[in-house]
Amino acid sequence: MPFKKLKPLLKDILEHLNIEDATPFQKGAIPKIKSGANVYAIGSENSGKTTALILTTLQKLKDYEEHDNPRILIFVKDKNAALTLQEKFEVFTKHMNLTLYSVYEEQAVQVQKDIIYEGVDIVIGTAKRLAKLYLSNSINLNDMNTLIIEDAQLLPRIDFGADIVRISESFPKCQYVVFSTEYDEKMKSLRNSFMANSVKVEA
């Protein structure tokens, strides 16, 4: 079972949340993501994608290590999605020595730059704002080891996809994980251009 190989703290939190068994999607996706492979994880609504995203992200990070720069970037569609995901993460991170921060267009770049400079482990944000921070040297991604896209259905939008690709091209050794609710023709084409050597998990 995927949960058995998680950190004890994560298992304790799952137990506290009354989450005992992994969903079929989580059984397929969590081991693949933990292996370090680039993964397209396709699951229906309520399949447990968000929990899988959070667990694999926190499993990868060592909360006792000192890092000033972000190690995880998570792309979401808008401010609402960023804050919602951050809130779900904080159910877990309030028990850990890890910091996360959300960035989006509705807040000043300088404010975001200053907070990130103080030290953030996980940055959640819109593609447009993350690209702006990166291209203006307002975010140091030298320690980044994972780039996650919460919903691949957003990628076919030209501006969204271009912003992500622009960042990803600078970090070829990074792990890429893309979540989606479906795997259609657009996704097949996208996989060939964005993550050609990825593993696809579908449940």
Question: How would you name each of these model-derived features?
Answer:
Residues 141-203:
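Post-DEXD/H (motif II) to motif III coupling segment of the RecA-like Helicase ATP-binding lobe
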Residues 67-125, 129, 144:
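Conserved nucleic-acid-binding Ia/Ib motif block in the N-terminal RecA-like helicase ATPase lobe
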Residues 42-45, 77:
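P-loop (Walker A) phosphate-binding loop of NTP-binding proteins
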Residues 26, 45, 125-129:
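Beta-edge loop/turn motif
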Residues 27-39, 48-67, 90:
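Walker A/P-loop NTP-binding motif
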Residues 1-42:
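Conserved pre-motif I regulatory segment
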Residues 32, 63-68, 93-96, 114-118, ...:
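Conserved catalytic network of the ASCE P-loop NTPase/AAA+ motor domain
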Residues 39, 72, 100, 146, ...:
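Hydrophobic/aliphatic anchor position in the core parallel beta-sheet
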